[in-house]
Structure formats: C-alpha cells, structure tokens
Amino acid sequence: MLKNLRETMRTAPIVRRGTYNYFIHPISDGVPVVKPELLREVIACMVKNADLDVDKIVTIEAMGLPLGAALSTMTDIPFIIIRKRKYELPGEIAVHQTTGYSRGELYLNGINKGDRVLIIDDVISTGGTMKAVIKALEKAGAVIKDIVVVIERGDGKKSIEELGYDVQTLIKIDVDENGVKILGCIDEECQ
C-alpha cells in the first residue's frame, strides 16, 4: 500500500546540520514536489487505519496542513490547525513546545470541551511537539481518540506512549549520512 512513500523515503536527500542528519522529503518538507499519488496513498492509509469516530481532526502547522486538508476532504471531518501565529481569540490556548532542535509557541483554537479528536502529523522524532499538543488538548477538555503520524524517527513515539496514548505511524525510519533506512511500515510490506 505504501509503495510511493517507501520509494521516496529511500531516495530522500540527507542534509547534515551540526551532528544531526536531516532527511528532506515531500511529506515532511514539501520539497522537491508533493506528488498527488504520494499524498493520496498516505491519506488512504490513514483512512484505513485511524479511528475516524471523531468530531475534529487536529494537525500542526506547517506540514500537517496538506495532510489535514486531504484527510478532512476524504472523511468530511472538519480539521483544526495548531498555528505558529497568535490570534488572541477567546479560548485560544498557547502550546509551549520544545523539540530536540527548537522551541517556541504554537496556538490552539476551535476545540470545545468533550470534542473527540484525531491528531495527525507528518513526523515524530523527539515527541516534544506532540507532548505539547496533547497537553493543550487535555487542557481544553478534548478527548484524544487516536494519533496517527506518517513518519517515525527516533524515540518520540515511546515518550507519547508513556503518557498513555498509542501512536500509529505509517513508516519507521533511521537516518545517517548514507541515507534513510526503513525499519518498518504499518502495512508490513516494507521491503
């Protein structure tokens, strides 16, 4: 099922910043080009595996945007974007995030107490952003029904599971100076 995702991961360029090897991929970076067949494949896999008995889909700016829009369109479930910009709307919740490579503020709007939500994102690595999102949703009184992330790298998934939440990832990778190594896939057809 994830043929395009696997192939584009295997051929993803690597950029070294300090001691960290970054992979550059259409799903996580929007470059070189996000092909519709890749996005369609990823969203079809999400539809197949996610708990869609929810009121809202929650995603994170920036690369969660195409995922959220596509999944919302496919399922008719409205989506909310956790933004990097403060709007100062009533009920806005600041999300304090710290990752392995950055820290900052994100802002949550449009969640009501009791909303059942599905969180989706492009990548989980340290888990810092996802932890902050979960805490903000809990503070708002939302019920987190499922968490689905396209790409898993590092130990971030474990840190979220320690909070009592399962995280489904479509593909698990490791990255070094030689490239991306695929460690597993949700569809078991990784080779």
UniProtKB/Swiss-Prot annotation:
The reaction(s) this protein catalyses: IMP + diphosphate = hypoxanthine + 5-phospho-alpha-D-ribose 1-diphosphate; GMP + diphosphate = guanine + 5-phospho-alpha-D-ribose 1-diphosphate
InterPro entries: HGPRTase-like, PRibTrfase_dom, PRTase-like, Pur/Pyrimidine_PRTase
Gene3D superfamilies: 3.40.50.2020
Compartment list: Cytoplasm
A single cellular component GO annotation: cytoplasm
The EC number(s) this enzyme carries: 2.4.2.8
Biochemical pathway: Purine metabolism; IMP biosynthesis via salvage pathway; IMP from hypoxanthine: step 1/1
Disulfide bonds: none
Keywords from the UniProt entry: Cytoplasm, Glycosyltransferase, Purine salvage, Transferase
Enzyme class, spelled out: transferase
Single GO molecular function: guanine phosphoribosyltransferase activity
Gene Ontology biological process terms from the UniProt entry: IMP salvage; purine ribonucleoside salvage
Coiled-coil regions listed: none
Superkingdom of the organism of origin: Archaea
A Pfam family recorded for this sequence: Pribosyltran
Subunit-level organization: Homodimer.
PANTHER family (UniProt xref): HYPOXANTHINE/GUANINE PHOSPHORIBOSYLTRANSFERASE (PTHR43864), XANTHINE PHOSPHORIBOSYLTRANSFERASE (PTHR43864:SF1)
Role this protein plays: Catalyzes a salvage reaction resulting in the formation of IMP that is energically less costly than de novo synthesis.
Family: Belongs to the purine/pyrimidine phosphoribosyltransferase family. Archaeal HPRT subfamily.
Protein name per the record: Hypoxanthine/guanine phosphoribosyltransferase
